[in-house]
Protein backbone atom coordinates (compact mmCIF):
# COMPACT_ATOMS: atom_id res chain seq x y z
CA UNK A 1 0.00 0.00 0.00
CA UNK A 2 2.85 2.34 0.86
CA UNK A 3 4.44 1.54 -2.47
CA UNK A 4 1.26 2.49 -4.31
CA UNK A 5 0.99 5.76 -2.38
CA UNK A 6 4.64 6.51 -3.10
CA UNK A 7 4.15 5.80 -6.82
CA UNK A 8 1.10 8.11 -6.97
CA UNK A 9 2.99 10.83 -5.10
CA UNK A 10 5.98 10.49 -7.44
CA UNK A 11 3.73 10.64 -10.48
CA UNK A 12 1.99 13.78 -9.16
CA UNK A 13 5.30 15.52 -8.44
CA UNK A 14 6.67 14.66 -11.88
CA UNK A 15 3.58 15.95 -13.67
CA UNK A 16 3.63 19.18 -11.63
CA UNK A 17 7.33 19.62 -12.38
CA UNK A 18 6.64 19.17 -16.09
CA UNK A 19 3.87 21.77 -15.98
CA UNK A 20 6.15 24.17 -14.14
CA UNK A 21 8.91 23.74 -16.72
CA UNK A 22 6.43 24.29 -19.56
CA UNK A 23 5.28 27.56 -18.01
CA UNK A 24 8.85 28.79 -17.71
CA UNK A 25 9.66 27.99 -21.32
CA UNK A 26 9.87 31.09 -23.43
CA UNK A 27 6.94 31.39 -25.79
CA UNK A 28 7.64 32.66 -29.29
CA UNK A 29 6.89 36.31 -29.78
CA UNK A 30 3.68 36.93 -31.72
CA UNK A 31 5.26 39.73 -33.71
CA UNK A 32 8.13 37.52 -34.84
CA UNK A 33 5.69 34.78 -35.85
CA UNK A 34 3.65 37.23 -37.92
CA UNK A 35 6.72 38.71 -39.58
CA UNK A 36 8.04 35.22 -40.33
CA UNK A 37 4.68 34.29 -41.84
CA UNK A 38 4.63 37.38 -44.07
CA UNK A 39 8.24 36.78 -45.12
CA UNK A 40 7.38 33.22 -46.12
CA UNK A 41 4.34 34.40 -48.07
CA UNK A 42 6.41 37.08 -49.81
CA UNK A 43 9.05 34.54 -50.83
CA UNK A 44 6.36 32.18 -52.07
CA UNK A 45 4.76 34.99 -54.09
CA UNK A 46 8.08 35.91 -55.69
CA UNK A 47 8.72 32.29 -56.66
CA UNK A 48 5.24 32.02 -58.10
CA UNK A 49 5.69 35.17 -60.20
CA UNK A 50 9.00 33.87 -61.54
CA UNK A 51 7.37 30.58 -62.51
CA UNK A 52 4.42 32.35 -64.13
CA UNK A 53 6.70 34.43 -66.34
CA UNK A 54 7.92 31.34 -68.13
CA UNK A 55 6.34 30.51 -71.50
CA UNK A 56 5.92 26.87 -70.50
CA UNK A 57 3.36 27.65 -67.80
CA UNK A 58 1.50 30.05 -70.09
CA UNK A 59 1.34 27.39 -72.80
CA UNK A 60 0.03 24.85 -70.29
CA UNK A 61 -2.65 27.27 -69.10
CA UNK A 62 -3.70 28.07 -72.67
CA UNK A 63 -3.92 24.36 -73.55
CA UNK A 64 -5.95 23.71 -70.41
CA UNK A 65 -8.43 26.48 -71.20
CA UNK A 66 -8.80 25.34 -74.81
CA UNK A 67 -9.40 21.74 -73.73
CA UNK A 68 -11.92 22.86 -71.12
CA UNK A 69 -13.73 25.02 -73.65
CA UNK A 70 -13.90 22.11 -76.11
CA UNK A 71 -15.40 19.88 -73.43
CA UNK A 72 -17.84 22.42 -72.01
CA UNK A 73 -19.21 23.92 -75.24
CA UNK A 74 -21.35 20.89 -76.18
CA UNK A 75 -22.56 20.57 -72.59
CA UNK A 76 -23.61 24.21 -72.44
CA UNK A 77 -25.39 23.98 -75.78
CA UNK A 78 -27.23 20.84 -74.66
CA UNK A 79 -28.18 22.44 -71.34
CA UNK A 80 -29.51 25.50 -73.18
CA UNK A 81 -31.55 23.34 -75.54
CA UNK A 82 -32.93 21.29 -72.64
CA UNK A 83 -33.85 24.46 -70.75
CA UNK A 84 -35.66 25.92 -73.75
CA UNK A 85 -37.53 22.63 -74.28
CA UNK A 86 -38.48 22.50 -70.61
CA UNK A 87 -39.73 26.08 -70.60
CA UNK A 88 -41.64 25.60 -73.84
CA UNK A 89 -43.32 22.49 -72.40
CA UNK A 90 -44.16 24.44 -69.27
CA UNK A 91 -45.63 27.27 -71.33
CA UNK A 92 -47.64 24.78 -73.45
CA UNK A 93 -49.17 23.30 -70.30
CA UNK A 94 -50.29 26.73 -69.15
CA UNK A 95 -51.83 27.71 -72.48
CA UNK A 96 -53.78 24.45 -72.98
CA UNK A 97 -56.38 25.02 -70.21
CA UNK A 98 -57.01 28.55 -71.48
CA UNK A 99 -57.77 27.34 -75.02
CA UNK A 100 -60.23 24.66 -73.91
Curated annotation (Swiss-Prot):
Pfam families: ApoA-II (PF04711). This is Apolipoprotein A-II. Keywords: Cleavage on pair of basic residues, HDL, Lipid transport, Secreted, Signal, Transport. The gene is APOA2. Monomer. Interacts with NAXE and NDRG1. Belongs to the apolipoprotein A2 family. Residues 1-18 form the signal peptide. Gene3D superfamilies: 6.10.250.100. Transmembrane segments: none annotated. SUPFAM superfamilies: Apolipoprotein A-II. GO terms for molecular function: cholesterol transfer activity; high-density lipoprotein particle binding; lipid binding. InterPro entries: ApoA-II, ApoA-II_sf. One of its GO terms (biological process) is lipoprotein metabolic process. It is found in: Secreted. May stabilize HDL (high density lipoprotein) structure by its association with lipids, and affect the HDL metabolism. Its main location: secreted. GO terms for cellular component: spherical high-density lipoprotein particle. Plasma.
Amino acid sequence: MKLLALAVLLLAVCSLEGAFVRRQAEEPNLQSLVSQYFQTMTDYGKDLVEKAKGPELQAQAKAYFEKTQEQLTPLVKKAGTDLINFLSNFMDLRTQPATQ
